[in-house]
Structures are given as C-alpha cells and as structure tokens.
Amino acid sequence: MAVISMKQLLEAGVHFGHQTRRWNPKMKKYIFTERNGIYIIDLQKTVKKVDEAYNFLKQVSEDGGQVLFVGTKKQAQESVKSEAERAGQFYINQRWLGGLLTNYKTISKRIKRISEIEKMEEDGLFEVLPKKEVVELKKEYDRLIKFLGGIRDMKSMPQALFVVDPRKERNAIAEARKLNIPIVGIVDTNCDPDEIDYVIPANDDAIRAVKLLTAKMADAILEGQQGVSNEEVAAEQNIDLDEKEKSEETEATEE
C-alpha cells in the first residue's frame, strides 16, 4: 500500500505545476496535462516516487544515518524546521552558507562559537563586560542561531539531503553531489530532475503541499528509527536469553 494517497495529494494542491512558459523539458515525463496555462503534475507518478523516497530515507535511518533538511524559501521554512526537529534531524531554513558541506571544518568553528557565547553568559561574563560588548555578542549569537542553529549538533556529514526546490537550493545540491551525498527533492515543473537522486514531482510553492511531503519524509525517518530500536531490543533479548541458558547449564552441571 502506498504511503500517501491521491486524495491527500489533491487536497494539498500537489498537482499544480508552474506556468507552461516556465518549465524544464526534462520534467515532461512527470506532467499529466496543461490547464489554463499551468502544467498539471501526474499524481500517479508522484505517489510512486514518494514511495521510493520514503523507503530510501527509512533505510538511511535504519542504518543509523542522519538527514539534512534544506528549504530556505518562505513556503518551506517552517515545515523544514518543524519536521526535521520532529524526526531528530538537521535543517537549514534561512540561507545556505557556501562551503557548509565542502568546507565543514570552517563552518564547524562558527558552530562552536554558539556554545562559547552560551558559556560566557552561563559563567556570568555578561554581567562584567561592557554593555556595548554584550549587545554585540547577543547579536552575533542570534545571527549564528538563525543560520546554523539547525546543524549545531551535526558532528559529521549527513548520509542524505532532503531538499525543497532544487532551483532555489542549487548551491546545497552542488556541494552534496560533489561529496556523493544522495539527494531527495521536491521537484516542480521548472526544475532539473537530473540533479536529484530521488525525485518527488510536486508543487514546491504551496505551503500545504510542502508540509505534506516534508512530513512524509520525516515519518520515513521515524519509522526507520523504530526499526533500529526494535533490532536493538531484539539483540538485547537474545543476549539475555544466551546468558540465562548459560546460567541454567552451569547450575545443572553443579547439581
């Protein structure tokens, strides 16, 4: 059974593409028809592609991998943040800083600065520093949290990227491709699907559509995590059973 229904997709307006004059011919195979100068996306293909993306992210999560959610356009910012947090993943929803993946060593120094400023406040340094300096530190902290707060706990490269609108996030995609990080993306009729490993043909401009699909990808990750925890429990139970059997064998021998 598909993880998403045609009814859900229709209600969220996932089928509305861009105007026919603003399209990428490579998206032709995902287009059902044209209506009033707007392309209509083939939702049967979207259902299938959502399944593929879901299963991929579920497997990444089962294997203990982390996913970076990227969506800096207004329609995606809230969904990307809330769904990444719900699944315990990382996100960028303001601006992609150049080198975020390819020059992570430098970016990680800026992330470290967040903790440094927090420690200064905890240690009471804000009480003794000049007021002007404290104001500047708070401004710096707010700026760092705004742009890097979503990846402050990211200690290594993500195993996958989930992107809303590849045209908008071309820098993120270029860096991920350079590092061979697989990309799942919500791809509208004006985008190049060749840049994306797991294409989800869909409206990337409607908040409801973006929310629905982003939530499904978060669900996939959560389901994968459930698989990991179930395996861990099963492994622990097997260890306990082995130890119990050994204990019973020892007692029988002693008797």
Curated annotation (Swiss-Prot):
Coiled-coil regions listed in the entry = none
GO CC, any one term:
cytosolic small ribosomal subunit
Task: Tell me which UniProt keywords the record has, alphabetically.
Answer: Ribonucleoprotein, Ribosomal protein
| PROSITE patterns noted in UniProt | RIBOSOMAL_S2_1, RIBOSOMAL_S2_2
| InterPro entries in UniProt | Ribosomal_uS2, Ribosomal_uS2_bac/mit/plastid, Ribosomal_uS2_CS, Ribosomal_uS2_flav_dom_sf
GO-annotated biological processes = translation
Database matches in HAMAP family: Ribosomal_uS2_B
What PANTHER family does its record include? 30S RIBOSOMAL PROTEIN S2 PROKARYOTIC AND ORGANELLAR, SMALL RIBOSOMAL SUBUNIT PROTEIN US2M
Q: What is this protein called?
A: Small ribosomal subunit protein uS2
Question: Its gene?
Answer: rpsB
